[in-house]
């Protein structure tokens, strides 16, 4: 808490004493009887608070007995202590003074004594975050008499009754046991070390003897707390002052200067000192009482001494006050009496615990500014948990703190920025807003809220609701759902124009809840008694108040009814919440049975029509009020709570991780449960009812994600419960209902196209039921495999559904933002069934048929095929041939689905399919090759499928004999030729390779290449095939293909690095090696296709180095002469080369820069070498140079370089 160095402000109340003052001087220390010190036993806590002196005495005696060591007797508590304690809890001291003219001093002392808080739980609550659930003790009285350790005058009378070891153990119990909330998270300033929490540090300071000079003057406690020296910090002494009233701390100050939301460790230490060691605290009456007993001389001496001791601080103020008092017309003389900071609260003062509003606002502002980083979301969730803890303690600061938090949320500048940019807020931030709205629902539904307080909240909520940036309930769009307090519109009412409805914000439901009340007599009877029945009531109508067994029912909009349960839990009424929850669940079960009977009747009357209207446009799972989660948590909490001392629960909803260590017990049945039923069975059944409800997929990304997230959270909670025979019966019962209940069930025969899919829920049901009822498990899972939103047409029976649904639920696809997640869940369900069906041919066939019918994603089917393959080929068992065939069948479907579409995993899929077919057997390989055109592209069929099938590894893997090898080879050759005919450009080479061993097939493939060479094949493909032919020992065929490739080629003058140059050189070398005729035939093609001078000169030189045909590829030698450059065909090549140099030179000179001059001179040098190969080359080159000098004489520097080199 933001403690400040100055003293607390003086009390507002003005104190004066008329002439017959109270109390004799020096009066004693209270009654001699000295009753128990903070007597408040946990047994007094349940239900309505104990009233009257007798109840207080009984509680006090029980507590005192618990505090005394064995063997000591306990005297009865005095009437003075009983009365004083009750007065101290309920009345402000001013009312006591006004009520009684004279109050004896012993009575004043006992009232002052009992006015300090007696529960350490509240001190802990205001000095640390709460990360666990509430304690088993439940909320304490408004007076603060909670479930912590209480010490009072009884302990004081006999001295300290605890040893140091016992004190230490008690401190640990207070910090970690059921007496206080568990604290496991750090505050914003303390990081993650639990020992640094203010409450823990306060206990450590107290037990280390660091608290000193403790003084209680009236309703004011002061003392010093010494902070031990910790290097490099020196020892510090903090002055602490605490004001209190009616067992609540109303203000705190500490000189440590620490600023935080919660009390600092020094305040904690002083408070716990007063609670644990009240006998060691000097107690004085309010200072005004002491002053009243002084005469004039004593008063003057008192004032002068006070000024002398503190003259530097007090003197200016003292002189100012003296001047005002001496002035007759001063304001101070217009008021009777004077303020007394130790005299307690006035009648008008609000009685609540001290909460530093400024620091709450500042901390929330800091957390929000961090934008979700540094654990700010966690810190804000802890603040929300603190609000819930305060509500459970029935502390008015809960609503006050939530108001401060909400104001900072509404002032977050990011809200307007997101609204302007049209972007959605982050998911974590959105969840914080949801929790904010849920907390306001709890607050306005407080069953004991005063009307004026509710009116104040309503006004504030409407103010926030009207702000433009106030977030919408559905995250992105205005919700079209009906009001909170009304049932869902059906029939003609459903046609109302939803576009005219205002947007619903996160506060809308809380605003609507302000209209709800708790005065209904039936509701009051339900929550107040376990014996509320009417066995004579036989009304069996839809809205009857009792069922046929006489048990009470509660008919209300289900989320609203569950919001009441949550409000009762949150405000510390767990028994009442449980009673209402049971009534709601019994109502749901009765409605479920009536829905089943109604559907069966309609089905008989209309046997050829299917009813598919959705009765729940507003689903319970993912609902902003989380009705199913509320009922489930309320019932599950009762499973591990003693029914006889039922006063509160640990919060299993807020911290489900802790509940894993709890064992859920089937406690004795409640009055309104069937024989053999328990809270566990009821919780599980209501969860199954909610999860199986048919409901429309909501609009907007956030709400759709919330539906998925809440469903998974609820299922994860169910999975923590171990199934026994009783729960299995519940599962069977609900599974049968889901299958037979028609439009009321998400697993009915025919559902609406936009219904939320049941894949995740069905997977849980399947795995749960499989060991107990496999047939039912498979029925559920197979029915849930549907994903109608992806179907091109609705089911036939859907055509006869009531048409009013269409206006309420428009066709929104593809606005299913979570579709990819839904499809993955569908895939998980199918994979689970495949795994379970291993070895069962009939089940596998059924599952396969369902997959092929309902899954529309090729990637998910491929994943299923892979999963099935892995399961079928586990290392520790023989391959399951049936499951392998299923895997292959799924793979074939993937091939067909992706054949005409682009898929980056296609090559992986093809390779995997061949692997799978190999495992199935040779007939599978033969089958996919024979029907390749429905599965693969020609390229895939030749380069991957046929090549892999013909590989040695496949032959070895399958242990094929010669006959089988030949059969596969024949199929592969047929495939290759078909592919080459269809796509010669990409398949010709593969076809030739595959047909090598069969002469006829090879010739056929070669002819296909020749036929395609003149039309569609590129020079690159032809050169590749030509090189292959040369490699296989067919030089003439290679030459033929090379000449065909040359006709498609075109190299310009500047493409001296073209990738085809090597192919051209290879083709010329091949022709040269074959003989003069072949060379003579290819040179005209080269001259026509190649314009690059350097390439032509390279070819020319290679042709002049050896005799044509001198070393043929076939090994023969030719002793002919070198070819002459003056005769064909080399003369034509030489002229073309010279011409290319001339043209290239002019082209380069057109756009030459000085930095390229030296490179150009080198180019001319190479050109001269080529010129000189002709018999008149010298003359030609000289003329060429002269011509350049004349044409480009403007390039003086360049021409000068030309002259220097070439003359």
UniProtKB/Swiss-Prot annotation:
> What is the reported tissue distribution?
Mouse embryos and newborn mice shown expression in the central nervous system (at protein level).
Region: Disordered, residue numbers:
1-52, 134-163
- According to the UniProt entry, which residue ranges have a biased composition of type Low complexity? 43-52
Q: Which UniProt keywords apply?
A: Metal-binding, Neurogenesis, Zinc, Zinc-finger
UniProt key word Protein transport: no
Q: Where is the composition biased (Gly residues)?
A: 18-40, 134-149
- MF annotations from Gene Ontology: zinc ion binding
InterPro entries under this entry? Znf_SWIM (IPR007527), ZSWIM4-8_C (IPR048370)
**Could you tell me the superkingdom of the organism this chain comes from?**
Eukaryota
Q: Point out which parts of the chain are SWIM-type zinc fingers, as ranges.
A: 238-275
* GO process terms (BP): neuron projection morphogenesis; regulation of neuron migration; striatal medium spiny neuron differentiation
Q: Does the keyword Kinase apply?
A: no
Q: Which GO terms describe its cellular component?
A: stereocilium
What is the deletion mutant like? Knockout animals born in Mendelian ratios, but show increased neonatal mortality such that around 40% survive to weaning. Mutants show a reduction in striatal volume and changes in medium spiny neuron morphology. They have alterations in motor control, including hyperactivity, impaired rotarod performance, repetitive movements, and behavioral hyperresponsiveness to amphetamine.
Q: What does this protein do?
A: involved in nervous system development, important for striatal morphology and motor regulation.
Q: From the Swiss-Prot or TrEMBL record, give the protein name.
A: Zinc finger SWIM domain-containing protein 6
Gene name of the record: Zswim6
């Amino acid at each position: 808490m933001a403690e400040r160095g100055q003293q607390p402000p003086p009390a507002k109340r003005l104190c004066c004493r008329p002439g017959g003052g109270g109390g004799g001087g020096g009066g004693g220390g209270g009654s001699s009887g000295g009753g128990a010190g903070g007597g408040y036993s946990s047994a007094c806590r349940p239900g309505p608070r104990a009233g009257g002196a007798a109840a207080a005495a009984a509680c006090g005696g029980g507590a005192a007995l618990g505090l005394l060591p064995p063997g000591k007797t306990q005297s009865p508590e005095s009437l003075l202590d009983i009365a004083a304690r009750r007065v101290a809890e309920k009345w402000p001291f001013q009312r006591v003074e006004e009520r009684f003219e004279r109050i004896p001093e012993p009575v004043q002392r006992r009232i002052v004594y009992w006015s300090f808080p007696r529960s350490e739980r509240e001190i802990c609550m205001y000095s640390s975050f709460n990360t666990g659930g509430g304690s088993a003790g439940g909320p304490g009285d408004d007076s603060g008499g909670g479930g912590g350790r209480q010490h009072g005058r009884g302990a004081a009378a006999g001295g300290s009754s605890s040893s140091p070891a016992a004190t230490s153990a008690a401190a640990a119990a207070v910090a970690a046991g059921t007496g206080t909330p568990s604290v496991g998270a750090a505050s914003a300033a303390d990081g993650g070390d639990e020992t640094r929490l203010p409450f823990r540090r306060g206990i450590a300071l107290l037990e280390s003897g660091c608290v000193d000079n403790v003084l209680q003057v009236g309703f004011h406690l002061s003392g010093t707390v010494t902070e031990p020296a910790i290097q490099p910090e020196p020892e510090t002494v903090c002055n602490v002052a605490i004001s209190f009233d009616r067992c609540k701390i109303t203000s705190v100050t500490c000189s440590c200067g620490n600023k935080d939301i919660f009390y600092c460790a020094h305040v904690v230490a002083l408070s716990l000192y007063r609670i644990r060691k009240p006998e060691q605290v000097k107690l004085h009456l309010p200072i005004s009482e002491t002053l009243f007993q002084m005469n004039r001389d004593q008063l003057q001496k008192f004032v002068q001494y006070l000024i002398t001791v503190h003259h530097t601080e007090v003197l200016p103020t003292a002189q100012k006050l003296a001047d005002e008092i001496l002035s007759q017309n001063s304001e101070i003389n217009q008021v009777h009496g004077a303020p007394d900071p130790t005299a307690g609260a006035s009648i008008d003062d609000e009685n609540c615990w001290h909460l530093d509003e400024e620091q709450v606002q500042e901390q929330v502002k800091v957390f929000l500014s961090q934008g979700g980083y540094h654990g700010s979301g966690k810190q804000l969730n802890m603040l929300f948990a603190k609000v819930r803890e305060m509500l459970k303690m029935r502390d008015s600061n809960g609503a006050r703190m939530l108001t401060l938090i909400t104001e900072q949320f509404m002032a977050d500048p990011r809200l307007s920025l997101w609204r302007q940019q049209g972007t959605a807020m982050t998911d974590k931030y959105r969840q914080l807003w949801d929790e904010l709205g849920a907390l306001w629902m709890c607050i306005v539904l407080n069953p004991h809220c005063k009307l004026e307080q509710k009116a104040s909240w309503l006004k504030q909520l409407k103010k926030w609701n009207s702000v433009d940036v106030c977030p919408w309930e559905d995250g992105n769009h205005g919700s079209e759902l009906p009001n909170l307090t009304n049932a869902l519109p059906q029939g003609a009412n459903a046609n109302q124009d939803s576009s005219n409805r205002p947007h619903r914000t996160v506060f809308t439901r809380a605003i609507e809840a302000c209209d709800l009340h708790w005065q209904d007599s039936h509701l009051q009877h339900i929550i107040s008694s376990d014996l509320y029945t009417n066995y004579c009531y036989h009304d069996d109508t839809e809205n009857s108040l009792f069922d046929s067994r006489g048990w009470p029912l509660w008919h209300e909009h289900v989320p609203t009814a569950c919001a009441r349960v949550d409000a009762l839990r949150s405000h510390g009424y767990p028994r009442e919440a449980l009673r209402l929850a049971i009534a709601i669940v019994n109502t749901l079960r009765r409605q479920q049975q009536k829905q089943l009977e109604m559907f069966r009747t309609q089905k008989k009357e209309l046997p050829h029509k299917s009813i598919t209207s959705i009765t729940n446009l507003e689903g319970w799972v993912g609902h902003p009020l989380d009705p199913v989660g509320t009922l489930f948590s309320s019932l599950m909490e009762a499973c591990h709570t003693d029914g006889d001392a039922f006063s509160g629960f640990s919060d299993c909803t807020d911290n489900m991780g802790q509940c894993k260590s709890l064992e859920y017990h089937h406690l004795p049945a409640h009055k309104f449960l069937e024989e053999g039923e328990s809270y566990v069975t009821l919780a599980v059944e209501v969860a199954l009812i909610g999860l199986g409800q048919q409901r429309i997929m909501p609009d907007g990304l956030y709400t759709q994600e919330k539906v998925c997230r809440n469903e998974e959270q609820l299922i994860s909670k169910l999975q923590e419960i171990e199934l026994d025979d009783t729960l299995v019966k519940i599962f069977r019962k609900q599974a049968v209902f889901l299958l037979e209940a028609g439009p009321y069930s998400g697993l009915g025969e025919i559902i609406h196209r936009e219904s939320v899919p049941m894949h995740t829920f069905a997977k849980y049901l399947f795995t749960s039921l499989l060991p107990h009822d496999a047939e039912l498990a498979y029925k559920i899972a197979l029915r849930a495999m549907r994903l109608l939103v992806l179907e091109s047409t609705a089911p036939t029976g859907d055509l006869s559904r009531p048409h009013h649904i269409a206006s309420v639920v428009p066709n929104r696809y593809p606005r299913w933002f979570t579709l990819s997640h839904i499809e993955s869940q569908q895939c998980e369900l199918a994979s689970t069934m495949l795994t379970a069906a291993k070895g069962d041919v009939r089940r596998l066939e059924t599952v396969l048929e369902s997959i092929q019918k309902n899954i529309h994603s090729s990637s998910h089917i491929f994943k299923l095929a892979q999963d099935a393959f892995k399961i079928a080929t586990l290392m520790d068992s023989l391959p399951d041939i049936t499951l392998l065939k299923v895997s292959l069948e799924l793979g074939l479907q993937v091939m067909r689905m992706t054949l005409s579409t682009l898929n980056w995993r296609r090559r992986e899929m093809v390779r995997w399919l061949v692997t799978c077919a190999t495992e199935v057997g040779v007939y599978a390989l033969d089958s996919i090759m024979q029907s390749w055109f429905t599965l693969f592209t020609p390229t895939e069929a030749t380069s991957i499928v046929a090549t892999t099938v013909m590989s040695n590894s496949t032959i070895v893997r399958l242990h094929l004999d010669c006959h089988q090898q030949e059969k596969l080879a024949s199929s592969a050759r047929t495939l290759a030729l078909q592919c080459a005919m269809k796509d010669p450009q990409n398949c010709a080479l593969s076809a030739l390779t595959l047909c090598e061993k069969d002469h006829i097939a090879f010739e056929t493939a070669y002819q296909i290449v020749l036929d395609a060479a003149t039309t569609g094949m590129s020079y690159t493909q032809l050169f590749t095939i030509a090189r292959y032919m040369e490699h296989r020992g067919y030089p003439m065929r290679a030459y033929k293909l090379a000449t065909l490739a040359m006709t498609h080629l075109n190299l310009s003058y500047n493409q001296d690095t073209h990738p085809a140059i090597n192919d051209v050189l290879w083709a010329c070398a091949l022709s040269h090696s074959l003989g003069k005729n072949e060379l003579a035939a290819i040179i005209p093609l080269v001259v026509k296709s190649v314009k690059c001078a350097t390439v032509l000169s390279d070819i020319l030189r290679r042709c002049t180095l050896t005799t044509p045909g001198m070393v043929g590829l076939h090994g023969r030698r030719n002793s002919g002469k070198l070819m002459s450059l003056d005769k064909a065909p080399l003369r034509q090549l030489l002229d073309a080369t010279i011409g290319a140099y001339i043209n290239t030179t002019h082209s380069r000179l057109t756009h030459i820069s000085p930095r390229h001059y030296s490179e150009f001179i080198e180019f001319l040098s190479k050109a001269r070498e080529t010129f000189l190969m002709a018999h008149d080359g010298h003359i030609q080159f000289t003329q060429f140079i002269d011509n350049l000098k004349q044409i480009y004489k403007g390039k003086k520097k360049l021409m000068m370089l030309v002259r220097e080199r070439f003359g």
